Amino acid sequence: MEVILKRDFISLGYEGDICKVKDGYARNYLIPRNIAVVKNAANLRTLAQMQKSLEKKRAKRKMEAEILKGKIVDITVVIPMKVAENGKLYGSVSQQTIVDALKEKEIDINKRDVHMEKHIKELGDFEVEIKLYHSVNANIKIKVVNVDENAAAEEVKEENTAAVEA
């Protein structure tokens, strides 16, 4: 069954896209949740009428994504973590950890937009890709540091303030 997306849906596409999905998925999930409508002549006419406003909306979102990319591309996110004696982290740095660290810097993104091959489980410097919009991606630097003593915590605060001032 072909459906027209009424809003962006991560696994299928973006608002206004026509997608082919299984009948049950469309009838039982997408349509009842108002994510999509069935592709038919009436809905195609509606889509054609809405195309201009969709283009304006997409252009606005892309511009906002470019502005956000400019803000975050130079940021180094310092994440303090507890470390075992063998150098491994207690726990790991996940997408949500990165989103929380960015929120402290007043940058709001969705955790689904943070792309990592696997969670970070050791100290060091890493690079993580953030998908901001269709073709607008930004790479941010993640620095995982040891929060063993007060000296390490002070170092983290100094680096965070330096990154915010930059």
Swiss-Prot record:
Signal peptide: none annotated. It holds the Pfam family Ribosomal_L9_C. GO terms for molecular function: rRNA binding; structural constituent of ribosome. Keywords: Ribonucleoprotein, Ribosomal protein, RNA-binding, rRNA-binding. Transmembrane segments: none annotated. One of its GO terms (cellular component) is ribosome. GO terms for biological process: translation. Gene3D superfamilies: Ribosomal protein L9, C-terminal domain, Ribosomal protein L9, N-terminal domain. NCBIfam families: L9. Binds to the 23S rRNA. PANTHER family: 50S RIBOSOMAL PROTEIN L9 (PTHR21368). Belongs to the bacterial ribosomal protein bL9 family. HAMAP family: Ribosomal_bL9 (MF_00503). This is Large ribosomal subunit protein bL9. It comes from Brachyspira hyodysenteriae (strain ATCC 49526 / WA1). The lineage of its organism: Bacteria, Pseudomonadati, Spirochaetota, Spirochaetia, Brachyspirales.
